[in-house]
């Protein structure tokens, strides 16, 4: 069951990860750029939300909590969405751990990406000026016997209801408003995302 119909076309480029060389008292150490940024409590959620990616993000959040449960974690999101169960594992971990998780949308946060964007700590959810956000209802497809199709259809409706409840909780919109707005794809600019309650403000420059 998916929260997005888009495919991730950028996975092959993940092999081209820059390395960072640091001088230490013991000599040189090399890190891939994402590991180096993890030391600064920065996590990237990019591309399709799927099980492997979700497990990596959950592991990074748990590691950073163990290192320092008082310092914020920064989750940068550029995602077209993905699998609901994978996204919910990230969502539940964000709510479970002690540090606040600040979310920042760069590029796009669509579907499950938008859901995770708005799930950040209140007052610490941001968009970059030219990013876009898209919300909609879960997508599902199943082939099989008629009875099984009916079972899966009921499950999709249950998931849709739960997602709408959580979106209403995080945005401050009424459940009825969320249900109307997610019936079809709804795209929002950064200012519109702020007005809707998906994020708290737009970041233009570092403080």
From Swiss-Prot:
GO biological process, any: proteasomal protein catabolic process
Any matching Pfam family: CLP_protease
Subcellular location(s) of the protein: Cytoplasm
Activity modulation notes: Inhibited by benzyloxycarbonyl leucyltyrosine chloromethylketone (Z-LY-CMK).
Keywords from the UniProt entry: Cytoplasm, Hydrolase, Protease, Serine protease, Stress response, Zymogen
Gene3D superfamilies reported for this sequence: 2-enoyl-CoA Hydratase, Chain A, domain 1
CDD domains, per the entry: S14_ClpP_2 (cd07017)
GO cellular component: cytosol; endopeptidase Clp complex; HslUV protease complex; membrane
Main location: cytoplasm
InterPro entries registered for this protein in UniProt: ClpP (IPR001907), ClpP/crotonase-like_dom_sf (IPR029045), ClpP/TepA (IPR023562), ClpP_His_AS (IPR033135), ClpP_Ser_AS (IPR018215)
Loss of function: phenotype: Cells undergo an apoptotic-like death upon DNA damage characterized by membrane depolarization. Decreased persister cell formation upon antibiotic challenge probably due to increased levels of MazF toxin.
TM stretches of this protein: none
Propeptide: 1-14
Conditions for induction: By heat shock. Part of the clpP-clpX operon.
Effect of residue 17 to A: No ClpA-ClpP, little ClpX-ClpP complex forms
Miscellaneous comment as given in the Swiss-Prot or TrEMBL entry: Acyldepsipeptide antibiotics bind in the ClpA or ClpX binding-sites, rendering the enzyme ATP-independent and indiscriminate, thus killing cells.
Family listed: Belongs to the peptidase S14 family.
UniProt cross-references to NCBIfam families, sorted A to Z: clpP, PRK00277.1, PRK12553.1
HAMAP family in UniProt: ClpP
Protein name: ATP-dependent Clp protease proteolytic subunit
